[in-house]
């Protein structure tokens, strides 16, 4: 059953992007990929600091959660699609999603044996995720600045 959940996390969210305007998805796809990079770094730090571990995964991933390569990218695109450029709305939506992630989703994943927190608590995880969200917003602003200044 866990493998079905993991494969669903890895594949299904990509189809949700088909519901959105293609041009706007393209605009935010880079920040989505940057989110995957940031989460990959976070998972590497977490492994070294013993903050959390991935207990079970799809066969080709080791310590990286399946959520990095799909769910985080798609959710990042969705959040930017719906809230950008308004920082206040963006941060409010991210705080709500990060609280749900830290206090609802992670305990569920731990309960079914996919994920465990060790030397970081739920609030610490929330802070990590919110910090990444702020970095992502700044990255998107930088992209906008670069592409607005570029000659067409």
Can you describe what each PLM-predicted range is?
Residues 1-152:
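Aromatic-rich, lipid-facing transmembrane alpha helices and their immediate juxtamembrane interface loops
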């Amino acid at each position: 059953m866990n493998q079905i959940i993991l494969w669903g996390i890895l594949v299904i969210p990509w189809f949700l992007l088909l519901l959105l305007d293609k041009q706007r998805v393209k605009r935010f796809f880079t920040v989505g990929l940057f989110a995957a990079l940031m989460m990959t770094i976070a998972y590497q730090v977490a492994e070294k600091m013993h903050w959390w571990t991935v207990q079970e995964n799809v066969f080709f991933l080791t310590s990286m959660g399946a959520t990095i390569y799909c769910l985080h990218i798609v959710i990042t695109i969705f959040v930017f699609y719906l809230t950008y450029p308004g920082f206040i709305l963006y941060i409010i939506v991210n705080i709500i999603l990060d609280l749900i992630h830290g206090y609802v989703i992670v305990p569920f994943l731990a309960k079914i044996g996919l994920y465990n927190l060790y030397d970081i608590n739920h609030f610490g995880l929330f802070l990590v995720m919110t910090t990444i969200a702020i970095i992502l917003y700044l990255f998107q602003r930088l992209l906008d600045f670069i592409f607005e200044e570029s000659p067409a």
